[in-house]
């Protein structure tokens, strides 16, 4: 039981870390102006920014993050169905 709890804890920790990581190798060459004037959705609009939802945002802000509560509930359901 303790081993299972440790494994689940490590998995949650890894998922949270992956969600919080910002890609540093994804840099954009040059500046393209405002979103909507030139770049399309997902294209560069600055040195480290991308067009997302009509605004110039960092890639980490643009990506959907997992809800930690939803993740915990799904893990609890998995635990209930495996016993």
Swiss-Prot record:
Tissue expression: Expressed by the venom duct.
Statement: the UniProt record of this protein carries the keyword Manganese: no
Any one GO MF annotation of this record: potassium channel regulator activity
Location in or out of the cell: Secreted
An annotated GO cellular component: extracellular region
Superkingdom of the organism of origin: Eukaryota
Signal peptide: 1-27
Keywords in alphabetical order: Disulfide bond, Ion channel impairing toxin, Neurotoxin, Potassium channel impairing toxin, Secreted, Signal, Toxin, Voltage-gated potassium channel impairing toxin
Post-translational modification: Contains 4 disulfide bonds.
Domain remark from Swiss-Prot or TrEMBL: The cysteine framework is XI (C-C-CC-CC-C-C).
Similarity comment: family membership: Belongs to the conopeptide I2-like superfamily.
Role of this protein: Acts as a neurotoxin by inhibiting voltage-gated potassium channels (Kv).
Name by which UniProt lists this protein: Turripeptide Lol11.2
């Amino acid at each position: 039981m303790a081993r299972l709890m440790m494994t689940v804890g490590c998995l949650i920790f890894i998922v949270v870390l992956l969600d919080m990581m910002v890609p540093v190798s994804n840099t954009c060459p040059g500046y393209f102006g405002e979103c909507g004037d030139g770049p399309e959705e997902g294209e560069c609009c600055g040195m480290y920014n991308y067009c997302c939802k009509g605004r110039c945002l960092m890639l980490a802000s643009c990506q959907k993050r997992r809800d930690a509560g939803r993740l915990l509930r799904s893990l609890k359901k998995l635990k209930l169905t495996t016993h």
